[in-house]
């Protein structure tokens, strides 16, 4: 969209898809409950996020190529439907196998939603406002991520079943499908050349694009690793119960939500690269504070600080990459979403390290993910 005029009637249904996008974060609090229900080890439990996020690596580029042919809105509705099916499975039949199948469905659906969402938003807002609106969309997504652990914990305590949150999510997903389907969005931004697997992979020869892809890998890996291990941090470092530790996830997502709302405002004035470095340093400071925390309250404050720092990293990288090559947005979106596989690989690594060296080792893994981002300003495009 090149016009500065903003059509709210088109932005709202697109923003609702970002709420559905946030449903994938339920894997964090779900991991704790599933581990307890089926008496899983730390290492095995961390393969639940793996079953969600591995599909970003498998399907992102094919989805980007298909999206180039059938359109962003149609691709989005396919992703929403697959997500809906995945959300319903554990409520219908609950076993470890059915949970894995459900999260595979949620992962595949979310992959499609993520590939389609940012380019679709690009169609309804101006290029100049894209960075700000991407942060605002992530703020909307963070509302879901914040409420998920609260609803799941409430359902577990009140009704003895955390899975009621999945029914709530399924209803919202159905509403999103219906609203988007009845909203007319003219897709004007077209690829200069037809997208293909080879054209996507060729973009990786651009050092800047490659750096952006690696950055997304570490950002999402750190985010999912943080989300799915907050309960463990508070339980093992400070003796919290599972239910009380679950509220730590909501503290994290509250910080993400605040960070993204403030980021949407600040990015009207600040350069994205400067903001990227500043917030990365803040996230690193939070990780160090968790490591050296002496009380549960101190650890919770540190978790909040990590969330404040990490909140805008994903939309910043996405907007920098897409704004750099807007006519290749479908392919770039596919590559960047493929890198979300970091969410499948970093948590199991953290689980292995935690089992062998202790919980502090898993926090060091998170710190290393953030440290990579500090080198982004030194990478220049060879385009």
Where are these regions (language model features)?
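Extracytoplasmic
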Residues: 9-40, 118, 226-231
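Helix-breaking motifs and short loop linkers at transmembrane-helix boundaries and internal kinks
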Residues: 39, 71, 92-97, 293-294, ...
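Cytoplasmic helix-loop-helix junction between adjacent transmembrane helices
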Residues: 102-139
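Central cavity-lining transmembrane alpha-helices of secondary-active solute carriers
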Residues: 50-64, 250-262
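Conserved MFS/SLC helix-loop-helix module at the cytosolic interface between two early adjacent transmembrane helices
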Residues: 58-97
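Extracytoplasmic gate region of multi-pass secondary transporters
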Residues: 27-28, 206-250
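Intracellular juxtamembrane helix-capping segments at the cytosolic ends
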Residues: 112-125, 311-326
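Helix-loop-helix hairpin linking two adjacent transmembrane segments in secondary transporters
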Residues: 133-185
């Amino acid at each position: 969209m090149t016009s500065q005029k903003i059509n709210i009637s088109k932005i709202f249904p697109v923003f609702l898809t970002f709420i559905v996008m946030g449903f994938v974060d339920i894997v964090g609090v779900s991991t704790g409950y599933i581990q307890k229900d089926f008496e899983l080890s730390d290492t095995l439990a961390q393969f639940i996020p793996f079953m969600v996020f591995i599909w970003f690596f498998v399907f992102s580029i094919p989805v980007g190529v298909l999206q180039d042919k059938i359109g962003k809105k149609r691709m989005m509705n396919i992703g929403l439907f697959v997500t809906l099916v995945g959300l319903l499975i554990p409520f219908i039949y609950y076993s470890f196998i059915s949970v894995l199948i459900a999260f595979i469905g949620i992962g595949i659906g979310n992959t499609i939603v993520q590939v389609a969402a940012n380019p679709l938003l690009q169609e309804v807002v101006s290029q100049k406002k894209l960075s700000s609106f991407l942060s605002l969309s992530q703020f909307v997504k963070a509302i879901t991520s914040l409420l998920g652990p609260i609803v799941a914990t409430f359902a577990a305590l009140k009704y003895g079943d955390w899975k009621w949150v999945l029914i709530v999510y399924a209803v919202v997903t159905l509403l999103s499908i219906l609203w988007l389907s009845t909203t007319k969005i003219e897709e004007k931004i077209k690829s200069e050349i037809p997208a293909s697997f080879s054209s996507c992979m060729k973009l990786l020869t651009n050092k800047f694009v490659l750096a952006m892809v690696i950055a997304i890998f570490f950002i999402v890996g750190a985010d999912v690793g943080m989300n799915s291990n907050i309960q463990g941090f508070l339980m093992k470092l400070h003796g919290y119960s599972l239910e009380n530790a679950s509220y730590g996830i909501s503290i994290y997502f509250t910080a993400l939500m605040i960070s993204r709302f403030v980021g949407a405002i600040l990015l009207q004035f600040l350069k994205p690269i400067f903001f990227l470095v500043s917030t990365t340093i803040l996230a690193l400071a939070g990780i160090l504070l968790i490591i050296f925390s002496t009380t549960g309250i101190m650890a919770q404050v540190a978790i909040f600080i990590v969330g404040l720092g990490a909140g805008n990293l994903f939309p910043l990288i996405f907007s920098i990459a897409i704004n750099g090559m807007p006519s290749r947005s479908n392919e770039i979106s596919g590559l960047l979403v493929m890198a979300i596989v970091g969410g499948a690989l970093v948590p199991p690594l953290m689980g292995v390290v935690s089992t062998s060296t202790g919980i502090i080792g898993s926090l060091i893994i998170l710190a290393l993910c953030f440290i990579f981002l500090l080198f982004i300003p030194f990478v220049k495009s060879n385009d």
